Amino acid sequence: MTTLKTMTRVQLGAMGEALAVDYLTSMGLRILNRNWRCRYGELDVIACDAATRTVVFVEVKTRTGDGYGGLAHAVTERKVRRLRRLAGLWLADQEERWAAVRIDVIGVRVGPKNSGRTPELTHLQGIG
């Protein structure tokens, strides 16, 4: 049986991304791509809001505690610049054109401070 203590960072990240995808779809977004990669990096989740024709690039941060700071500390200006670059590369490769583009961060907290409870999700919209 896999527990939080025995999970690898990759497994923990995959669990957080799955929870984030479930949340996004429950909010009415359609998932276009997961773990899109190119030579410059990776985009965790790419979703769209069909009602507003907005494409949303989502960075997912999964934490088991506050050891590395909160969600605001997890996404630096450098990380936002990287996400913008990756989003631009993804968009350049698409035939569809979008009315708007947004970069969001979803924080997923699991683990000791959240033991026995449903994972806590925090959604920051339009960070860059």
From Swiss-Prot:
InterPro entries, per the entry: Restrct_endonuc-II-like, tRNA_endonuc-like_dom_sf, UPF0102_YraN-like
Tree of life domain: Bacteria
Listed SUPFAM superfamilies: Restriction endonuclease-like
CDD domains: PoNe_Nuclease
Molecular function GO terms recorded: nucleic acid binding
Family: Belongs to the UPF0102 family.
Protein name stated in the entry: UPF0102 protein MRA_2923
Organism for this UniProt entry: Mycobacterium tuberculosis (strain ATCC 25177 / H37Ra)
Lineage: Bacteria, Bacillati, Actinomycetota, Actinomycetes, Mycobacteriales
